[in-house]
Design a protein with these regions (language model features):
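Conserved N-terminal phosphate-binding loop of PLP-dependent enzymes in the Aspartate aminotransferase
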Residues: 1-378
Length: 378
């Protein structure tokens, strides 16, 4: 049976990984500066992570949410301890799209309203309301377009105010660092205005931390760089280091009721074991401190490359913007220099999302290869 052909693929077949490297079926080593869309947070095959999953598999891999699973509470407590998000409650699911879907559903339950505000170049997933709130018409089917969404420019405080005053908006959803859209960030004034306007208009403020969370910004959550208190915080990608897991942190003002949210696989024993291993490693290896040190070093190196016209993002969620489309450059880096990087909706942007335990030597290797690739492409 052929696979449904929806992914344009590079001709590389990774079969193993260790740390910041992956190895293909021919034994070639690649430096992974992309982590499969910011999923690999603590490095490929980290021994703590591998051992935790193996140990759990020896006991119980899965049972449904019809029984007690103490691992879920352990994971919730660890997220609270590392993030500093006190008094929030955790609902576990399986992916970022599912996290955002449940966040929007919960906002509608809480407010009794159904319209959503999202922003230009935002990406929130490929399902139902989440994809309707995504600024990409190519992936929105007619069935998704039934969801009422106002998509506004980033930093448009007056636009947000005008839409909220109509009285029918259940949620404002925003990425504090845009991922697929191209690493743009709103201003502090903008984010803080959203927070105040939502509170004044019975609207839920959703901070989409699916890609920017789990230490990638240099703080546990990207919204923590600002003076805001989101109502709902969707999380996923770096949460399981490759094991499918997602969730939403829910402000205590939102009351839970039996059956309002649910999932078969969400919060299963293996997923929780993976999630705990990631958090324990972020803590024990001081990876958020490393993010800040490596980010400063990376940005300093990037500033020495004249072809780089703009450096976007923060922490280890970075974008290098050129004055030409980077598709060929990415191919050169993969096939000739054996390095994985990412693209974005902005075709002139190279996206950098490495594991959080990257070292200076890896960054040096990247910039040496980038200089050679840029020279070859001139």
């Amino acid at each position: 049976m052929p696979l449904f052909d929806v992914y344009p693929l590079y001709n590389v077949t990774p079969v193993s990984g260790k740390g910041i490297h992956v190895y293909d079926d021919k034994g070639v080593e690649y430096l992974d500066l992309y982590g499969g869309h910011a999923v690999i947070s603590i490095g490929h095959a980290h021994p703590n992570y591998v051992q935790a999953i193996k140990n759990q598999l020896d006991h119980l891999g899965f049972y449904s949410n019809a029984i007690q699973n103490p691992l879920q509470k352990q994971l919730a407590d660890k997220i609270e301890a590392l993030s500093g998000c006190k008094d929030y409650e955790l609902f576990l699911c399986n992916s970022g799209a599912e996290a955002n879907e449940n966040a929007l559903k919960l906002a509608s339950f809480k407010t009794g309203k159904k319209r959503v505000i999202a922003f230009n170049n935002g990406f929130h997933g490929r399902t139902s309301a989440a994809v309707a709130a995504t600024d990409n018409k190519n992936i929105i089917a007619p069935i998704n377009a039934q969801q009422a969404v106002a998509i506004l420019p980033l930093n448009d405080i007056e636009g947000v105010k005008t839409e909220l005053e109509k009285g029918d908006v259940c949620a404002v959803i925003v990425e504090f660092i845009q991922g697929v859209g191209g690493l743009d960030q709103g201003s502090a004034e903008f984010f803080e205005a959203i927070d105040k306007l939502c509170k004044a208009n019975n609207t839920m403020f959703i901070a989409d931390e699916v890609q920017s969370g789990y230490g990638r910004s240099g703080k546990f959550f990207a919204f923590q760089h600002y003076n805001v208190t989101p109502d709902i915080i969707p999380i996923a990608k770096g949460m399981g280091n490759g094991f499918p897991i997602g969730g939403i942190l829910i402000h205590p003002d939102i009351e839970s009721k039996y059956g309002m949210l649910g999932t078969t696989f969400g919060g299963n024993h293996l997923a929780c074991a993976a999630g705990l291993a990631v958090l324990n490693t972020i803590e024990s290896e001081h990876l958020m401190d490393n993010v800040n040190v490596m980010s400063d070093y990376f940005i300093g190196m990037a500033k020495t490359i004249p072809q780089i016209k703009n450096i976007k993002g923060r922490g280890l969620m970075l974008g290098l913007e050129f004055d030409f489309e980077v598709g060929q450059l990415r191919k050169d880096l993969i096939y000739n220099h054996h390095m994985f990087t990412g693209g974005a909706a902005n075709k002139k942007l190279l996206r950098i999302l490495p594991p959080l335990n990257i070292e200076k030597t890896h960054i040096d290797q990247f910039f040496e290869a980038l200089k050679k690739a840029l020279s070859a492409n001139n």
